[in-house]
């Protein structure tokens, strides 16, 4: 049976790049919240972005079951920033007998800030359609993110 690869990591940690590697090596479909929200809302999600993100995540959980049932692997490319989110995913797939793997993309703060600066520069220069992350938003994400315990994940990517 196909499986679900669940990516955990901070914004701008390399999840989307890693998801492409998994897509190629495991013949998987990527379900990315950012791809949809950026396509529909651009940089202007504002206060409604959180609502769209929550609804997309719910939709992607259901859609991933359909995809796996057809025999195709799935990569969930969003952060799973909290233990509660990770626990929900484990329960969701485990209760349905669907195989899953958690992959954590580890990044130190120095490298993270360097990548954020590069991303923001690329966004401003129209070289990237990723989200622009200002200092306030970066600190908000940093305060929310809970680094998983080693026993929470199947693959720890340095």
Predicted regions and their residues:
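P-loop (Walker A) phosphate-binding loop of NTP-binding proteins
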Residues: 10
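Walker A (P-loop) ATP-phosphate-binding motif of ABC ATPase nucleotide-binding domains
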Residues: 4
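Conserved substrate/cofactor phosphate-moiety recognition/catalytic segment
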Residues: 13, 17-72
């Amino acid at each position: 049976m196909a499986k679900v690869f669940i990516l955990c990591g901070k914004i701008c940690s390399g999840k989307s790049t890693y998801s492409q590697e998994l897509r190629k090596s495991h013949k998987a479909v990527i379900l990315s919240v950012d791809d949809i929200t950026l396509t529909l809302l651009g940089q202007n999600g504002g206060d409604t972005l959180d609502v769209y993100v929550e609804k997309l995540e719910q939709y992607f959980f259901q859609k991933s079951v359909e995809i796996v049932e057809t025999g195709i692997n799935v990569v969930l490319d969003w952060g799973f920033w909290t233990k509660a989110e990770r626990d929900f995913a484990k329960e969701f797939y485990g209760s349905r007998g669907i195989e899953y793997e958690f992959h954590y993309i580890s990044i130190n703060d120095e490298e993270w800030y360097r990548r954020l600066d590069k991303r923001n520069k690329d966004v401003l220069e129209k070289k990237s359609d990723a989200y622009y992350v200002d200092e306030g938003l970066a600190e908000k994400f940093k305060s929310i993110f809970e680094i998983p315990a080693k026993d929470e994940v199947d693959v720890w990517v340095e």
